């Protein structure tokens, strides 16, 4: 009996500093401008992976979303992450190497424009947690600018690159602040994309909408509209959010 308890303890994730410990992997982010946050976790837990065979994460940062998709998807699924900022790309590579899915995830330190022009593969699932601040007021940190501000990757450019890289019936999924999500969907429609799913997110019931998850496709079809509150009125995580994160967050 003691031996069994000991074996169980060995399997428990080891909590470490400089990053975020999930049930099956650790994401170091101390060298990344943008840290692990709810936006990335939402996208990684939500995107439809059932029919995916080749996945692309544009602006992969620490590798968080790529790792979450690897955990959720079939063993034969191959995942590419593209990251412009050298330190973040290096850290993403390290996170991947230490994960259970090192053979399935490949990190490319490259500009997405060059990647889109030269990469031979197309993807049936593309994901991105893109920059969303206008470049009017820059940060002091150039790497943080790259991660946060659209000057390095405009939404127009993101849509154009995704169009070049997606399969005919592929899905393109993003997470954005709600107001920008509305604008992103409008811009996508002008470029021939169709919204197939939209999730409007608020922190808790009665609070303003603050995030949006979008699934876009080049193929027309029914649009599914959903709502998600991250917390209940008393402040605890909602059952719907717990269901999303239960395979990832410790103690859920």
Swiss-Prot record:
Protein name: tRNA1(Val) (adenine(37)-N6)-methyltransferase
EC number(s) on file: 2.1.1.223
GO BP of this protein: methylation; tRNA processing
The family this protein is said to belong to: Belongs to the methyltransferase superfamily. tRNA (adenine-N(6)-)-methyltransferase family.
A Pfam short name: MTS
Intracellular or extracellular location(s): Cytoplasm
Species in which this protein is naturally found: Yersinia pseudotuberculosis serotype O:3 (strain YPIII)
Enzyme class: transferase
Catalyzed reactions: adenosine(37) in tRNA1(Val) + S-adenosyl-L-methionine = N(6)-methyladenosine(37) in tRNA1(Val) + S-adenosyl-L-homocysteine + H(+)
Lineage of the species this protein comes from: Bacteria, Pseudomonadati, Pseudomonadota, Gammaproteobacteria, Enterobacterales
Gene Ontology terms: cellular component: cytoplasm
Keywords: Cytoplasm, Methyltransferase, S-adenosyl-L-methionine, Transferase, tRNA processing
Lineage: superkingdom: Bacteria
Coiled coil: none
Annotated SUPFAM superfamilies: S-adenosyl-L-methionine-dependent methyltransferases
Function description: Specifically methylates the adenine in position 37 of tRNA(1)(Val) (anticodon cmo5UAC).
Single Gene Ontology MF annotation: tRNA (adenine-N6)-methyltransferase activity
PANTHER family per record: TRNA1(VAL) (ADENINE(37)-N6)-METHYLTRANSFERASE (PTHR47739:SF1)
């Amino acid at each position: 009996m003691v031996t069994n308890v000991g074996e169980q303890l060995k399997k428990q994730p080891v909590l470490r500093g400089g990053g975020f410990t999930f049930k099956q992997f650790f994401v170091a982010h101390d060298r990344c401008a943008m840290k692990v946050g709810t936006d990335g976790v939402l996208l990684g837990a939500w995107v439809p992976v059932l029919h995916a065979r080749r996945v692309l994460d544009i602006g992969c940062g620490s590798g968080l979303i790529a790792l979450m998709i690897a955990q959720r998807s079939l063993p034969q699924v191959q995942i590419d992450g593209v990251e412009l900022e050298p330190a973040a790309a290096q850290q993403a590579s390290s996170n991947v190497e230490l994960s259970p899915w090192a053979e399935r995830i490949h990190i490319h330190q490259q500009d997405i424009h060059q990647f889109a022009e030269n990469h031979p593969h197309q993807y049936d699932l593309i994901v991105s947690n893109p920059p969303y601040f206008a470049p009017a007021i820059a940060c002091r940190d150039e790497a943080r600018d790259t991660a946060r501000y659209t000057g390095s990757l405009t939404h127009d450019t993101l849509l154009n690159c995704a169009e070049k890289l997606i399969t005919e019936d592929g899905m393109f999924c993003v997470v954005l602040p709600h107001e920008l999500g509305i604008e992103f969907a409008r811009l996508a429609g002008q470029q021939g994309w169709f919204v197939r799913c939209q999730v409007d997110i608020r922190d808790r019931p009665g609070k303003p909408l603050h995030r949006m998850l979008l699934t876009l496709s080049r193929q027309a079809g029914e649009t599914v509209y959903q709502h998600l509150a991250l917390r209940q009125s008393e402040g605890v995580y909602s059952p719907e959010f717990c269901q999303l994160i239960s395979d990832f967050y410790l103690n859920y």
